[in-house]
């Protein structure tokens, strides 16, 4: 990617986005619903490892349960924070997330969504996640750790070009 920090500015994720942790209504079984008007309940099992976007959920929670969780909207990122930590996904749907997710939002002023996705997946960011998570009993990330991760922030024009190229490669199976 754009790895030259001398040529492109480096910023912490906290400088360009808001980060918070998901929350779970407890006990969750009291808030699950089959009502079509329920709120999407986004879980790791709804997403395959190769997915970029979250487009569906298997379960929904009640509106009361949503008040005790974290609401997310299309374009927000969710980042797994334990076990297979550091995997980013772009939301294509509205819903709520539990405390196994970190939410990254309000980044659009500084970052192209697709560029940001590939940057979060890049070795230079993943190695920071790994270093931060090592040493804990169960390897995991939290909001304070992720806030301090540094990313390269080239001009939005270069980010857009990168995103266009990545979409082209993905469309034709080059990625």
Feature roles, as predicted:
Residues 1-3, 26-31, 88-91:
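Intrinsically disordered, low-complexity boundary segments flanking structured domains
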Residues 1-25, 148-175:
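Non-catalytic DNA-recognition/assembly elements of restriction-modification systems
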Residues 13-18, 48-54, 90-94, 102-157:
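Basic, amphipathic alpha-helical recognition segments used for DNA target recognition
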Residues 23, 85-86, 127:
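Glycine-centered loop/turn positions within well-structured domains
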Residues 39:
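Alpha/beta-hydrolase fold active-site loops
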Residues 43-44, 56-121:
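A short beta-sheet element
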């Amino acid at each position: 990617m754009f790895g030259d920090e001398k040529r492109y500015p480096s910023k912490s994720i906290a400088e360009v986005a808001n980060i918070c942790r998901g929350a779970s209504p407890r006990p969750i079984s009291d808030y699950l619903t089959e009502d079509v008007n329920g709120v999407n309940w986004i879980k790791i099992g709804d997403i395959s490892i190769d997915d970029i976007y979250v487009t569906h959920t298997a379960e929904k929670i009640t509106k009361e349960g949503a008040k005790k969780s974290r609401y997310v909207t299309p374009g927000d990122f969710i980042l797994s924070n334990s076990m297979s930590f550091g995997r980013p996904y772009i939301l294509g749907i509205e819903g709520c997330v539990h405390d196994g997710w970190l939410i990254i939002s309000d980044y659009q002023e500084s970052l192209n969504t697709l560029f940001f996705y590939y940057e979060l997946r890049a070795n230079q960011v993943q190695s920071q996640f790994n270093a931060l998570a090592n040493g804990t009993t169960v390897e995991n990330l939290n909001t304070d750790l992720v806030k301090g991760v540094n990313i390269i922030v080239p001009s939005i024009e270069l980010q857009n070009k990168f995103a266009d190229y990545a979409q082209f490669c993905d469309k034709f199976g080059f990625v």
